[in-house]
């Protein structure tokens, strides 16, 4: 895989809880209309968050839980743990299964990290979510349906790249994840028009690739 090739993630485990135990539902603080849960793990957290947002657009589901695991998929407690756990909540098993199906399709064929170099040791994500669903719009505090540039890279690359992205287009920083995240990366959500978000993603990509080519730039 040379630089810019996609790094395709995998779903590592998936189950449906058709009817959640009442006591467990209270512990999870589920609203009364959530009776079923879809559980899914995958080996790329940010790709899975994007997929979860897609599920909210294709099925009557909500993301009731989503957390990354510490240190990434390579250091998980089991092969099925992956890098992230998502719980989709819905009124019945059919809606939850539809949401999980949407997530699997997105994980396998949608947004993906890319290699920044031929050595395949630096990965980044620069993806335009053209129309946010309920999950990402709520997370970022933007209006439902607003476009978003979803940017992730290692700490220095992300810091340099986010600045470059914001200088390149008419975009607003709505979420910043300083390093280190649970997986030792850094991230930002930018919002603006689709064209502006695309320009921001391109500038972020160029910045990450520039560091990959020449890591130590002396003044």
Curated annotation (Swiss-Prot):
Tell me its applications.
Artificial BMCs can be made in E.coli by expressing eutK, eutL, eutM, eutN, eutS (eutSMNLK) or eutS alone. Cargo proteins can be targeted to them and beta-galactosidase (lacZ) was active within the BMC, showing the BMC allows passage of substrate into the interior. This can lead to the development of tailored BMCs for specific metabolic reactions. The addition of eutQ to the eutSMNLK construct results in biogenesis of multiple BMCs.
Cellular location(s): Bacterial microcompartment
Q: What does induction of this protein depend on?
A: Part of the 17-gene eut operon transcribed from a single promoter, induced by ethanolamine and adenosylcobalamin (AdoCbl, vitamin B12).
Question: Does the keyword Lyase belong to this entry?
Answer: no
Q: Name one GO cellular component term.
A: ethanolamine degradation polyhedral organelle
Residues annotated to bind ethanolamine 2? 46
Single GO biological process annotation from the record: generation of precursor metabolites and energy
Q: Looking at the record's lineage, which domain of life comes first?
A: Bacteria
Which UniProt keywords are listed?
A: Bacterial microcompartment, Virulence
Q: Where is the BMC circularly permuted domain?
A: 1-113, 114-215
- Note the site residues: Important for gating: 70, 184
User: Where does it primarily localize?
Assistant: other
Which residues take part in binding ethanolamine 1? 45, 83, 113, 183-185
Q: How does it assemble?
A: Homotrimerizes to form a pseudohexamer.
**Other noteworthy facts:** The need for a bacterial microcompartment in EA metabolism can be bypassed by increasing the levels of EAL and an acetaldehyde dehydrogenase (not necessarily EutE).
- Which protein, by its recorded name, is this? Bacterial microcompartment shell protein EutL
Q: Which organism is it from?
A: Salmonella typhimurium (strain LT2 / SGSC1412 / ATCC 700720)
